[in-house]
Amino acid sequence: MRWRAVQLVGVELVYLLRLLVLARILLPEAFGLIAIAVTSVGILMSVSEVGMVQALVQAPHATREQYDGAWTVGLLRAAVVTVALIAAAPVIAHLFDVADATPIIQALAFRPLIDAAASIGVARLTKELHFRRLAMMQLPAAVVDLLVAVTLAGSLGVWAIVAGTLSGALTSTLASYAVARHVPRLSFRFADLLPLIRYGRWILITGIVALAGTTLTQLIISRSLGAAALGVYFLALKVAFLPSTAASAVVGAVAFPIFAQLRGEPERTSAAFRQLLAGLLLVLIPVYAMVFVLAPSLEMALGAKWAATSPIIRIIAVSCVIGVFGELLVQLMLGQGRSDAAFRLELVQTGTLVVVAWPLISAFGVAGAALAWLVGNLAAAIGGLHWLRRRVQLREAVDFGLTACAAAAAAGAGFAAAGIWQAWPGMAGLFAAGICGAAAAVAIVLLLAHLFKLRLDAVIAWMRARAERGPA
């Protein structure tokens, strides 16, 4: 768990630094072009995703032939996606009504091919919880991305982001062979993959549905409000989702293999879900309190060109806290082999998002897209509770002591961050406010845990033990 946290938090912090520095240098239009390209790549990757990596992690006894076959399928899939994107880029750019996006899409089309060339042994490392070696692969890639993008931003503009993205992906791929120590071979024995494909078909459908909502939202913004508005939305979304992405990835990387190994043991599965949910809420509620308080400060630090970013970040912050439950629930569903249930949950969220996106964007502009996310997450949380109520007892996960502890830490973090910002405005003050707010939150959590003898130590010890040993 410790190394998974180092990997994810480190990568997300580097990414945040890269994002903020580039936002100071580049215009929102540049981020709008990147958003279109990233969405385009994501569409074709999702419609061709067969869930091979997840299936390998979930499978109790995957063979060498299955690993090589999965790598071959991934490489062929990425090659098809790359060629298709290069050919379809002008049409996609026209659809978004931004002709300048064409060469950006074509350049980033090579990202899936670079990623797919990585060693499939990474799936085994994930399954066996070797997070230290995974961190040694991802952190250098993030740093290379940062250095290349920031160094070239002044001279190349939006192309600096493209260069950084491709450089980081290449670094990750090369590093995968050093840490995974598995050199895959081309294998066309696809009969070995049928068990994986049967599991992964729901991953494919779920990915398509999830991306449909994101794509539709960005398409509406681009065509009705322009590339600059899409850039503002893209930046706000990335900033607001960073804490949730990092925390969910840290816990999710442990949760998925744990739930897979606890399959058929409902009592232990229930206990694991409660502990993980409690830990996530304890971390994310204070963090998002800081995000909510500091959102206007971030907007001021970035400059007038990023006006209207603050309300979007605040709405998404609330949405992310609600979405924590759904994120963990999906890991439970996948680990238990219920990828069909994960699809239905995603269908509820995306279906709600699609229904409300157009009227909310028409009424509130870019902030309406954030509101659509909030409504979608609420709908998914309600649907998830309905599915879970007969499977897991949740009352311990929302234990009053832990909830009160998180709320107090949130308040302390918010006040500390706001106070530092008032005394020291600017980008440096923003980072100082974040650090002081986090320190205040940690101090309050530890103090209350000691005074009221909360189960915080038990939660942390349990997560560490599971990360290091896996379930018995």
Q: What are these regions, as identified by a protein language model?
A:
Residues 415-472:
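Membrane-proximal transmembrane or re-entrant/amphipathic helices at the cytosolic face
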Residues 102-112, 135-182, 198-199, 347-355, ...:
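Hydrophobic alpha-helical transmembrane segments
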Residues 1, 55-64, 114-138, 159, ...:
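Membrane-interface junctions at transmembrane-helix termini in multi-pass inner-membrane proteins
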Residues 3-16, 141, 161-168, 172, ...:
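Transmembrane helical elements of multi-pass membrane transporters/channels
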